[in-house]
C-alpha cells in the first residue's frame, strides 16, 4: 500500500502547497477545476467557489496548470517533470483535450 502512495502523496502535496490550479477529470468524463485544499488516502478536497470532496476511486486524471515538479533531483542529477519524462527530450506538440471531442 505504501508503494502506491509514494508518487501520489508528494504530487498532491506539491499541488496543495503551491496552490496550483488543477483540472480533475472523473471516470464519467466530468471535469472539475479548483485547487487541492487537502487530501487523504481516499479523497481529495477540491476548492473553487465551494469545497468539494472527490473520492479518488472516481478520478481518472489530475492535470495541474502549469506543470509541477513534485520531487527533487534524481540520482543522475537531472530533475524530471511530473510525467517522469526526460526534460531534455524533444517536446512534441500536445493536442488540447477540449478540442478532441
From Swiss-Prot:
Taxonomy of the source species: Bacteria, Pseudomonadati, Pseudomonadota, Gammaproteobacteria, Enterobacterales
Region forming the signal peptide: none
PANTHER family: RNA-BINDING PROTEIN HFQ
PROSITE patterns: SM
Oligomer status and interactors: Homohexamer.
Family: Belongs to the Hfq family.
Entries under InterPro entries matching the protein: Hfq, LSM_dom_sf, Sm
Location of region: Disordered: 62-101
CDD domains the record matches: Hfq
GO molecular function, one term: RNA binding
Compositional bias ranges of the Polar residues kind: 70-86
Keywords: RNA-binding, Stress response
Domain Sm: 9-68
GO cellular component: cytosol
SUPFAM superfamilies in alphabetical order: Sm-like ribonucleoproteins
Described purpose of this protein according to its UniProt entry: RNA chaperone that binds small regulatory RNA (sRNAs) and mRNAs to facilitate mRNA translational regulation in response to envelope stress, environmental stress and changes in metabolite concentrations. Also binds with high specificity to tRNAs.
Biological process terms in GO annotation: regulation of DNA-templated transcription; regulation of RNA stability; regulation of translation, ncRNA-mediated
Protein name: RNA-binding protein Hfq
Amino acid at each position: 500500500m505504501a508503494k502506491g502512495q509514494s508518487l501520489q502523496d508528494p504530487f498532491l502535496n506539491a499541488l496543495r502547497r503551491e496552490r496550483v490550479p488543477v483540472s480533475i477529470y472523473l471516470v464519467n468524463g466530468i471535469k472539475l477545476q479548483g485547487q487541492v485544499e487537502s487530501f487523504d488516502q481516499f479523497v481529495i478536497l477540491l476548492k473553487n467557489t465551494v469545497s468539494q470532496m472527490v473520492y479518488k476511486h472516481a478520478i481518472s486524471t489530475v492535470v495541474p496548470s502549469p506543470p509541477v515538479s513534485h520531487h527533487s533531483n534524481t540520482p543522475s542529477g537531472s530533475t524530471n517533470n511530473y510525467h517522469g519524462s526526460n526534460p531534455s527530450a524533444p517536446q512534441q506538440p500536445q493536442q488540447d483535450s477540449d478540442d478532441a471531442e
